[in-house]
Curated annotation (Swiss-Prot):
Cell location: Membrane
Gene Ontology MF annotations: identical protein binding; protein tyrosine phosphatase activity
Tissues/organs with expression: Detected in brain, lung, kidney, heart, liver, skeletal muscle, spleen and testes. It is developmentally regulated in the brain.
Protein's name according to its UniProt entry: Receptor-type tyrosine-protein phosphatase gamma
Amino acid sequence: MRRLLEPCWWILFLKITSSVLHYVVCFPALTEGYVGTLQESRQDSSVQIRRRKASGDPYWAYSGAYGPEHWVTSSVSCGGSHQSPIDILDHHARVGDEYQELQLDGFDNESSNKTWMKNTGKTVAILLKDDYFVSGAGLPGRFKAEKVEFHWGHSNGSAGSEHSVNGRRFPVEMQIFFYNPDDFDSFQTAISENRIIGAMAIFFQVSPRDNSALDPIIHGLKGVVHHEKETFLDPFILRDLLPASLGSYYRYTGSLTTPPCSEIVEWIVFRRPVPISYHQLEAFYSIFTTEQQDHVKSVEYLRNNFRPQQALNDRVVSKSAVRDAWNHDLADFLDNPLGTEASKVCSSPPIHMKVQPLNQTALQVSWSQPETIYHPPIMNYMISYSWTKNEDEKEKTFTKDSDKDLKATISHVSPDSLYLFRVQAVCRNDMRSDFSQTMLFQANTTRIFQGTRIVKTGVPTASPASSADMAPISSGSSTWTSSGIPFSFVSMATGMGPSSSGSQATVASVVTSTLLAGLGFGGGGISSFPSTVWPTRLPTASAASKQAGRTVLATTEALASPGPDVHSAPSKDSEGTEEGEKEEKSESEDGEREHEEEEKDSEKKEKSEATHTAAESDRTAPAPTPSSPHRTAAEGGHQTIPGRRQDHSAPATDQPGHVAPDLDPLVDTATQVPPTATEEHYSGSDPRRPEMPSKKPMSRGDRFSEDSKFITVNPAEKNTSGMLSRPSPGRMEWIIPLIVVSALTFVCLVLLIAVLVYWRGCNKIKSKGFPRRSREVPSSGERGEKGSRKCFQTAHFYVEDSSSPRVVPNESVPIIPIPDDMEAIPVKQFGKHIGELYSNSQHGFSEDFEEVQRCTADMNITAEHSNHPDNKHKNRYINILAYDHSRVKLRPLPGKDSKHSDYINANYVDGYNKAKAYIATQGPLKSTFEDFWRMIWEQNTGIIIMITNLVEKGRRKCDQYWPTENTEEYGNIIVTLKSTKVHACYTVRRLSVRNTKVKKGQKGNPKGRQNERTVIQYHYTQWPDMGVPEYALPVLTFVRRSSAARMPDMGPVLVHCSAGVGRTGTYIVIDSMLQQIKDKSTVNVLGFLKHIRTQRNYLVQTEEQYIFIHDALLEAILGKETAVSSSQLHSYVNSILIPGVGGKTRLEKQFKLITQCNAKYVECFSAQKECNKEKNRNSSVVPAERARVGLAPLPGMKGTDYINASYIMGYYRSNEFIITQHPLPHTTKDFWRMIWDHNAQIIVMLPDNQSLAEDEFVYWPSREESMNCEAFTVTLISKDRLCLSNEEQIIIHDFILEATQDDYVLEVRHFQCPKWPNPDAPISSTFELINVIKEEALTRDGPTIVHDEYGAVSAGMLCALTTLSQQLENENAVDVFQVAKMINLMRPGVFTDIEQYQFVYKAMLSLISTKENGNGPMTGDKNGAVLTAEESDPAESMESLV
């Protein structure tokens, strides 16, 4: 600290200060980016588009410089006269006799498993692989459907359809495109040859209930969240996605609604919508796209992906001639053309606002009528304008009849005043439209004002590149609401006025001085107020009183909200506001908590701005005069006006001139706005009017060119002080304060840096080069003793050990404390906590995950090494980078290319109570195999966790970095595969790793003596990319076993998937939380995840994965660890039979968990369809949708893909068994089709009821006659018998299934078993049949089909005991609970009685006893209990199980 007092520091300080002042004085108009004229920007934009066109890959978007108004530059057809979409006016549509019933062929069939969905970046498309044909409806022939596309709005059911009817737009529009297969072989060929194609438009309308027909689509959307993602869809029926009645439709000739906009489309627009719930709508709003501006790519939400509506021109819209179809509820449809929201507004906003000077003292305002009129006719227009002069604000509103020219002349214009104009349409009953664009005019300079930004049309916004894993986050600025606020200068400046629908107006809290400076009023900055954070309700009394005690000042940062909040098309201006207001209505009503969270976010943002450069420190804070004392408004930063009563506020505590100490003192609130207002208009003499600061210092952006017609601030840039204005005569008045402020700011920065350097130096000395360990939040009993001790206090940034090369960082990394309210949750309360998160459509999970997404937004963590040109090829994905501060550094290789040989895309990640517990990395590339194995050797890694398959959905996710057999050499590392063990959901490989450069006993060898080590790879094989596993239990088993394999002398556990973020982060969180549960009986998922997000980007990639973590942990808490070694099983069984405090045994509690499964696992809607009900013997034993065995559907027949059968997980494969019912006479062929489709070669028949009729009991053909199943025939070729030890017999049939079209043959063996399990036989005989089946299965492929009469307990028991016996053989342990629960999850209704569950335990005890005692003497009873001769203690005997 003494160095700060040395003269050289002060000399340096004075030089820097003088340089800053010289820069500010000499270049006051410089901004972050070049701001040119409108003509220049349009020219640049056109050049960029022409370049893309020349390259053969024209880029287009739904907004910005490549938005719809620019499509014509790259696709000339987009400027044609017959473009789509259009607004269809029902009363103008004529009935066409040629438009009769629509004929659909194949639409009633379920789609095949080849149908797939893709996120194209512009929409979500379904590629249809089945035959769907459309004819009729005036189409010139029989057309084949090839693809389906969707268009949607911003959020919460806002308008998103491309077409509209009578001005009514819907949340989603689905479009089905088809072509003539007689002329072309594909849809794309028809477009390229400019031939006629067809399209259907189907509207989706919000309904209170889920539409089950959409479930496969919604499930598919979750698999294509990110750009270019693809997924196969579950079977669906395309007809179910259409309206119930197809008779009412409109017809017109139009174009494609996307480039190339070819005018070749025969449109069929259905009048009736299809229902969709808000919950299902959310899947559309979660889709991401990649936006591109020049060479910069950014990941944004894909929203508002619709083209603006086009003019009808000379075209005619026709209606179908199916008259009865138009009668039903048409009146209701027309009376309310836009539903609940549109019924409140007169029309869309007036468009094409212009302000032009007529002479020195007069202006002319002109506009065009709204594109859509919801409640015609328009009676008149209201022109409102406001102006300022000599710090006094004037305002005037007048009306103009709609039948006259849409122009207004404003006389007596002063060149020294600022004028703001906007127009509103008025219909009958004083129903009004939304306001038009707000135009700002001063001294021949016109600006378009949208929302809270001044924008220049046609200029692309260059967004910073981000990852597909991170959604853009809106940071809410302080806001307040007012009921009926007048249309004052403030409401104009924020682009918001009184709501035209009579609802509460939403007004941005402040218009800061940057806006006013650019217009000649003062210096400062303008805040961005994303629509997603504007409340539409007044705060509650309690919330307002909490918020009233502090002053919140305006910030200078404009943040881009997710989705296009600045529309390029004028017709969308009001829609953005309307959609934002709709979104607010779905927000949580817990007002206090929302305001507190916004308040904290605002504080963090404002504190961070205190350290900005001098370019942003040219703002002053004028203190209010003593004659104007004020109170603060809730979170708004507004000062109340003397004499005006403030509702819902606490008594004032702040003194005049007081500034909150924790906020930026350099920010100026230029306008003072009352938190409440009356319906009366303000007058110039009203003492309650907002006051302007008496002095108007200019910012750097206080000059503008007289030649500029439009001046813009790029909303994607952070500095919004780039608006240009005239110089002010009071320029020198703020230079002295600026010097003082700059000096103080610089001193504070130097002191802060010195403190940080000192603090980090102390930590290095204390920790001897290792980071401090994370501390945990104490349990509830410890909190009183530990005080305010919190979990994961800071993010750890690492000091590498001596074996790693050191790189001097370019900048210091900030230390991020975890929020104070992040406390661990006791496990007893975790179930209740999850219930709260699931409530309100999983709103709690969404809030938590948004907080996770924001936690690193302001940290400025660098990843320069990943972006270095020499390292970019080492990254599997361009947007998944390794943070510099926590990256794993390899020892540099000798040679000329050694400079960047220390890089690998991997980061250290902390675990529970252990720093650097994991290494999170990407799936290795072939070019990085050597680096990967070097890292494993140097880090002494003994466990590899792999959570991806090499290829998924046809895409390479990871390259195989281990030898398939024998040995492979990767640089200096030789890897040998020692063994492979395959389990149902994961595979364990034991690898030997040897370093040829390390000799035994060499000093550089971390282990000191060995040059060979063993590395175990745990490879989970059932985890879908960007998704989650179907069931949590197998994942828990995988995590527990891989975690238990780690030895104390091993280095970090290496975890990777494909990108090394989503599935990798999920594993790390589950593993760490399981350790915390074991150690402290507490859980802190949110706090821990926010902590590790500072160490590798985007760990836990999706909200779905975040929810899965909670589900898995809850499963672990409820079920506990149930795997038991064979030697402990007897004592374990006795312990779970002891009644607890409530009188219930743990066995009863386990069985309750088995039978009470989560509702999402037991959905059985396919089995409950009317066409399938007759195929079920017992409606209570049907397949769950997640594990249902599907059949290849037969063409033209509905429901032919259904059979009452379920996959069951075994020990070696996830679909090792299929449990089904005894075939019914009319489902016998379905049974054999299932065998054929799934290549099953073993059938085990367990008859529960011997009273079945002969024709029903025997479902196979006789030897004399084959059974014909169309695609194949079934022939019995032999029959044999196998005697068991109890003299019972198994009848064995051998069948051959031969294809009728080719030479394929499938051999099937059928075991017709006696009564099993036999209650009259010893329990040990139970495994005799199982051993026969197991031995046969070793030589056969495909699943084993097991059936009893209903496909219930007997079949389930055989699968359970087979799996458990295999587990006992391989692991010398069993997990009865997990096996039984998995069977009940995959086929609900198998285990329904606790005695069935007890029998599984008895059988396993018998098997273990048999193995331990050899074939010693056994005594059996008829109830199935077994006693060995040596057993004498009744408490320890299996008799106690009865």
